[in-house]
């Protein structure tokens, strides 16, 4: 359901939605990804 999806953060195309996990300011490429953190800040998706 698109209403449930997370808005992509600034820097992405406005109006796009993220159906996958968000990591920091970006959208992970697949639903099974987890976010790797550095000092509590999301730095990259681990897929």
UniProtKB/Swiss-Prot annotation:
Annotated positions of the Hydroxyproline modification: 10, 21, 29
Disulfide links within the chain: 18-27, 23-35, 28-45, 33-47
Post-translational modification: HydroxyPro-10 is only found in a minor form.
Tissue: Expressed by the venom duct.
GO MF annotations, alphabetized: acetylcholine receptor inhibitor activity; ion channel regulator activity; toxin activity
Transmembrane segments: none
Subcellular location(s) per record: Secreted
Keywords: Acetylcholine receptor inhibiting toxin, Disulfide bond, Hydroxylation, Ion channel impairing toxin, Neurotoxin, Postsynaptic neurotoxin, Secreted, Toxin
Main localization, broad class: secreted
Any GO CC annotation of this UniProt entry: extracellular region
Subunit (UniProt): Homodimer. Pseudo-homodimer (identical sequence, different post-translational modifications).
Domain notes: The cysteine framework is XX (C-CC-C-CC-C-C-C-C).
Family from the record: Belongs to the conotoxin D superfamily.
Function (record text): Alpha-conotoxins act on postsynaptic membranes, they bind to the nicotinic acetylcholine receptors (nAChR) and thus inhibit them. Through its two C-terminal domains, this homodimeric protein would bind to two nAChR allosteric sites, located outside the nAChR C-loop of the principal binding face and at the adjacent binding interface in a clockwise direction. This toxin specifically blocks mammalian neuronal nAChR of the alpha-7/CHRNA7, alpha-3-beta-2/CHRNA3-CHRNB2 and alpha-4-beta-2/CHRNA4-CHRNB2 subtypes.
Name under which the protein is recorded: Alpha-conotoxin VxXXC
Species in which this protein is naturally found: Conus vexillum (Flag cone)
């Amino acid at each position: 359901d698109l209403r449930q999806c997370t808005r992509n953060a600034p820097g992405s195309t406005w109006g796009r939605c993220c159906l996958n996990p968000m990591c920091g300011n970006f959208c992970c490429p697949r639903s099974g990804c987890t976010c790797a953190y550095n000092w509590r800040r999301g730095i990259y998706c681990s897929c």
